[in-house]
Amino acid sequence: MKERKNSAAAFEQAKQIIPGGVNSPVRALKSVGTTPLFVRDAKGPYIYDIDDNKFIDFSMSWGVFILGHNNDKVSKAASDAIFHGSSFGIPTLAETTLAEKVRESFPSMERLRFVNSGTEATMSAIRVARGFTGRDILVKFEGCYHGHADHLLVSAGSAVAKLNNASSAGVPAGFTQYTVVLPYNDIEALEKYFAENGDKVAALIIEPVACNMGVVPPTREFIEATRKVTQEHGAILIFDEVITGFRLSYGGAQKRFGITPDMTTVGKIVGGGFPAAAFGGRADIMSVLAPEGPVYQAGTLSGNPVAMAAGYETLKQLGEPGVYELLEERSNRFLSRLEKIVEGKGIQVNHVGTMFTMFFNDQPVRNFQDTKKSDQERFARYFRNMLDRGIYVSPSQFEGNFISLCHTDEILDYVLKSIEESIE
């Protein structure tokens, strides 16, 4: 058992001024029956807390650090940039050079704009889609998270489309009246809704691989159907690649699946560890944005030069030959061995590329309703057991874990041994 007295004291101090003691709910570790560790430093695959404990990190700031924490070249790029100024509210060349780098890897983003978070990116993309189509209805899928904008905090309570069912207090009914939620991986429900209402739909937004109910891959037929029905009815297909962008390949999930959306959002990796995200798409769609068009969007710190520099250096390294092949090879080796370890033990390993979730569930997990059948108490015990062994896995049954270039085979071997000891 690792001592975390300093972290416990820091948490009590934080709770006196920050609601719940944290700036994002999952960080409180409430669902896994413990209190948060407070981080002092991070390097490569490791994080170090204020009690001088060292942990192998499998959250990697929720997938941001695909190169590992505190990459030397990325840190230097950021420090060099900040020497010249951290924000100007005036254009810089750094914005254009990173935008060109993003478009190089995501050709579907013919025009793009930077914002500060994934929530801003999805919120802005939806506004653009509505402005372009002149329609109101947004279709999303149960269990897919697209940020905490009011009209996106909606989920269905059954395997049918529902309107106006907010999943957070403080969201007025009127904010969600144009959001429709369909069951994930259900082609029949998707086709039925579009057959009856498709001409009213402004956009369909989807995580091309669901990551925020745990990693739940789409069936090939389902993800292809999202492209088919939107094209048939003139609706905008938005791929929310805030997590999968630059994670599943240099061109994200859309390159991996060979499907071209009308609009895309990227985040996390694109800022190299700094607050940054982007939304973009076809040039004709993006032309409705002010100052060229009537759709307004703005941000004081959008495209700040420090994030742009860190993002550019990150993408530069990811674009080097063999990077994704190495990531895939290392991940496949780890995950194939993990599947053998958990076989017959009531655990499902869902994975795509370097992302995976261990569902403590007897049955395959294909949608949000399946995820809710998972044993959260068993997961919580597993999380605490892993923490005691010096491994920080993502602290929720309904989140993904992420492998980075810094997770060597030796480290992954130790993680496998620890998993075998930690599951019940």
Language-model features, listed with the residues they occupy:
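Conserved N-terminal phosphate-binding loop of PLP-dependent enzymes in the Aspartate aminotransferase
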Residues: 1-424
